[in-house]
């Protein structure tokens, strides 16, 4: 069937990704940065579309996605702005893809309209916020000032985001995987909330033992006319 064929393609993609990532070694863990761990978790979670716009200290997540996603035939687009990237997320999510973006405080603020539209349309999406100091332009030092903004949703209307706050590089990976699970279970935006220190911190990461198969048909997704 087409579903099983798509599943086989995904498994080959993930196998190739892990072959590249492990540098042809059989080790089960490596020393990696938190930002890299996010992408590892996303790949295992079946993320097949990453749309984003670079901003310090989240830019490394885009760098890693731009490096690994094309290697295994997944979609990466550097948008022209934060507003464009969150609207690409909206479009990808509406067709059932596992979508993700990453940004920091000023960029997250620009995405708020997209957040509320995702919630209103009941679409799953994962947004990673690597927080930096504010208010305004602020600086690139680490801070936890985006907490109220992302927990309360940020955009207009009565809705909430699901928010996961990792405490280690391992949790940067594990909670990114969990974010995709929750986003698709509840059809709601999920934010992985960390700061610049955690994004730059390097710790041993144990790779996930199982991967998520993203080829399960979502009955609510827009598939186009046939």
Locations of the language-model features?
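Short basic, glycine-rich beta-strand/loop surfaces that mediate nucleic-acid
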Residues: 120, 179, 206-208
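Structural beta-strand/beta-sheet cores of well-ordered domains, especially the beta-sheet scaffolds
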Residues: 51, 123, 162, 188-190, ...
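Single conserved hydrophobic/aromatic residue that forms the stacking wall/gate
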Residues: 1-13
């Amino acid at each position: 069937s087409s579903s099983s064929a798509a599943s086989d393609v995904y498994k080959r993609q993930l196998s190739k990704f892990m072959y590249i990532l492990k540098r042809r070694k059989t080790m089960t863990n490596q020393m990696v940065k938190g930002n890299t761990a996010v992408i590892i978790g996303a790949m295992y979670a079946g993320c097949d579309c990453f749309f984003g716009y670079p901003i310090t200290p989240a830019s490394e997540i885009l760098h890693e996605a731009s490096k690994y996603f094309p290697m295994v035939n997944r979609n990466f687009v550097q948008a022209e702005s934060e507003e464009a990237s969150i609207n690409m997320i909206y479009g990808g999510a509406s067709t059932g893809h596992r979508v993700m973006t990453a940004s920091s405080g000023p960029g997250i603020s620009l995405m708020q309209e997209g957040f509320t539209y995702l919630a209103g349309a009941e679409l799953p999406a994962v947004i990673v916020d690597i927080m930096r100091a504010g208010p305004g332009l602020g600086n690139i030092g680490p801070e936890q000032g985006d907490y109220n903004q992302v927990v309360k949703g940020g955009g207009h209307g009565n809705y909430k985001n699901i928010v996961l706050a990792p405490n280690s590089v391992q949790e940067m990976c594990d909670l990114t995987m969990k974010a995709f699970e929750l986003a698709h279970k509840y059809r709601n935006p999920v934010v992985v909330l960390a700061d610049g220190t955690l994004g730059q911190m390097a710790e041993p990461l144990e790779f996930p033992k199982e991967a998520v198969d993203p080829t399960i048909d979502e009955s609510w997704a827009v598939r186009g006319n046939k």
